[in-house]
UniProtKB/Swiss-Prot annotation:
The keyword Flavoprotein does not apply. This is Uracil-DNA glycosylase. NCBIfam families: PRK05254.1-1, PRK05254.1-2, PRK05254.1-4, PRK05254.1-5, ung. Keywords: Cytoplasm, DNA damage, DNA repair, Hydrolase. Its EC number is 3.2.2.27. It comes from Bacillus velezensis (strain DSM 23117 / BGSC 10A6 / LMG 26770 / FZB42) (Bacillus amyloliquefaciens subsp. plantarum).
Length: 227
């Protein structure tokens, strides 16, 4: 099969792409992309893995499925493309970021700068139909993204897993807590942010954990883009 990922992830995951479930998922996606409006663009599906090589992962922020509005999703959990209005959950993430470590709120919603520093921004489902949340749930993506979580968990080097909300916290059973750190709270969505997300200080706590491991902390402050 054609190599879909850069070497570091391909070496970990290539066997998955030959399995029957992935072949079925691939056929479904071919039909969906040819007959429906699907997000993100097919070239962006694996951006979480393209921006953050396997050996560079320091932290994981798990999301659910991609944003389903025009121009939003680009393959990174919680992130939107520059020039697109920040969705409510992302606005709340930036409020907590400001309260936690004093970063000013950026003039865009792209989290690429985090991904390039080793933050794996992984959704558990990697595609969605326009305007239909969870439309590709249960189609096979979860098996692949569970395997991604597993190969990260298998690494010797400790990692910080940031789990916001029940959906992400269901993955706790896949994480070896004798080796890795879990930081969790409610989801940053407007429905739950005030019930434990605000004030949870995930960014400073992640950096404190990384420094304790002897790792470079993450510069969470996101630079503004030129207007």
């Amino acid at each position: 099969m054609k190599q879909l990922l850069k070497d570091s992830w391909w070496n970990q995951l290539k066997d998955e792409f030959d399995k029957p479930y992935y072949q079925e998922l691939r056929e479904m996606l071919k039909q969906e992309y040819s007959s429906q409006t699907i997000y993100p663009d097919s070239h962006d599906i694996f951006n979480a893995l393209h921006y953050t090589p396997y050996e560079d992962v320091k932290a994981v922020i798990l999301g659910q499925d991609p944003y389903h509005g025009p121009g939003q999703a680009h393959g990174l959990s919680f992130s939107v493309q520059p020039g697109v209005r920040q969705p409510p959950s992302l606005k709340n993430i930036f409020i907590e970021l400001q309260d936690d470590i004093g970063c000013s709120v950026p003039n865009h919603g792209s989290l690429v700068s985090w991904a390039k520093q080793g933050v794996l921004l992984l959704n558990t489902v990697l595609t969605v139909r326009r305007g239909q949340a969870n439309s590709h749930k249960g189609k096979g993506w979860e098996r692949l993204t569970d395997r991604i979580i597993d190969v990260v968990n298998e690494r010797e080097k400790p990692i910080v897993f940031i789990l916001w909300g029940r959906h992400a916290q269901m993955k706790k059973e896949r994480i070896d807590t004798s080796k890795h750190i879990i930081i969790e709270s409610t989801h940053p969505s407007p429905f739950s942010a005030r019930n434990g997300f605000f004030g949870s200080r995930p960014f400073s706590r992640t950096n404190a954990a990384l420094e304790k491991m002897g790792e470079q902390p993450i510069d969470w402050c996101i630079p503004d883009l030129p207007q």
